[in-house]
Amino acid sequence: DLDPHRPFVDDVAIQCPECENTAHRVPEVIDCWYDSGAMPFAALGYPRKNAEQFAQQYPADFICEAIDQTRGWFYSLMAVGTLVFGESSYKNVVCLGHILDEDGRKMSKHLGNVLEPIPLMDTHGADAVRWFMLASGSPWQARRVGHTAIADVVRRTLLTYWNTVSFQSLYARTAEWSPATGAPATGERPLIDQWVLSEAARVARDVDDALDNFDTQRGGRILAEYIDDLSNWYVRRSRRRFWDGDESALATLHEALHTVTLCLAPYTPFIAERVWQDLFRATDDQAPISVHLASWPSLENATINDDLRDNMALVRRVVELGRAARAASSVKTRQPLSRALVSAPGWAQLPDELVAEVADELNVRVVEVLGEEAGLVDVVVKPNFRELGKRFGKHTPVVAQAITDVEPATLANSVRASGSFSLMVDGNSEDVYADDIIVTESPREGWTVASDAEESVAIDLHIDDEL
């Protein structure tokens, strides 16, 4: 048997049938990585042929391999390309982190913790594995892969998307609604409809930008957050409208899901295709025959409303504070209450339609502006001697006394609003910060209050006969 390695191959001599000279092994040996580095042009036979194809493909837009290729293929591609053509053979590179098991150990046959990709896809679906690898975590970091982790991303995002599609399909059929039925113009729909469509346009724009920059994680995060907003805020807040067959709600959810499905297609091609066929092709015979033949969502006629985005974000923060206030008082949301008072920058300018969303969500008759929070909360401010001691040393007792001399609500509100409060200590001005004081707030009897930064919600707990 011929051994093609040195030194045995050195003894091999081949007689040339044409020139009758003897051919021996070339004594110089080039690094085998040169072949890999020459791949972009050698695979095409360039420069002897395929010049036009080479010009279209070189340099490549993107390359990815594991971190160990930094000194291997990544380097040889860059070195050979730069040497021959004066530029690297790729524009963008990602060094993938290693795949670990769920306990953070390197996968190995010895440990018996190797997960084969095909059985993993058979269990969870190819799209679940794709979504996990593309969207959950930075690709350059080591990643723990296991059944639990993949099942979790399916539950939180893909299943939520699927259930929202099923919800739309069910209520559209019940109302005998289709896109051909028509709906009011976007600007004539309720603000919550305008908001969710504005955010859909924002998602299309931002996911497009993320994918153009090869950042699948950012694009996936944007999609996951929007799917959660769509299901757990828009659909939940609009549920009664769907029960009533409201055309505006049905059209809005259909349009939002259309955008989401197109944006999901590069991540989850099989689920997106199934939804495209069942929800969009089934209701529009002019739609492309596949989601993968459809155009990316057009922003030409879309409106991205930043003010509405900020207003809805404020509404949702106030709702969270209201829920926290109710939870603190052990009064469940099922119990109607008379009023909620809100103190927050921008609240007084909020449209009545969005204020009504808060009232309905918190199950109160009215929501009003909270004029003076101190009237509903007993505030106690104590010096934080540990933090004060770090700054003032032996002068800490004097500073602590100056803190206790200030009206508590005034001091607490100032620190909350601006981050500090100026005190006069022995004729000198000293700033007190949030870490320097311990603030305790207790609602007055009959009220429950929750606060965060500059925003507060107070709920009246008095229940009259009607309530």
Model-inferred region functions:
Residues 63-73:
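N-terminal catalytic cores of NTP/NDP-binding nucleotidyl/phosphoryl-transfer enzymes
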Residues 138:
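Active-site loop segments of alpha/beta catalytic cores
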Residues 1-34, 38-40, 46, 84-126, ...:
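Feature 926 captures the class I aminoacyl-tRNA synthetase adenylation module centered on the KMSKS loop
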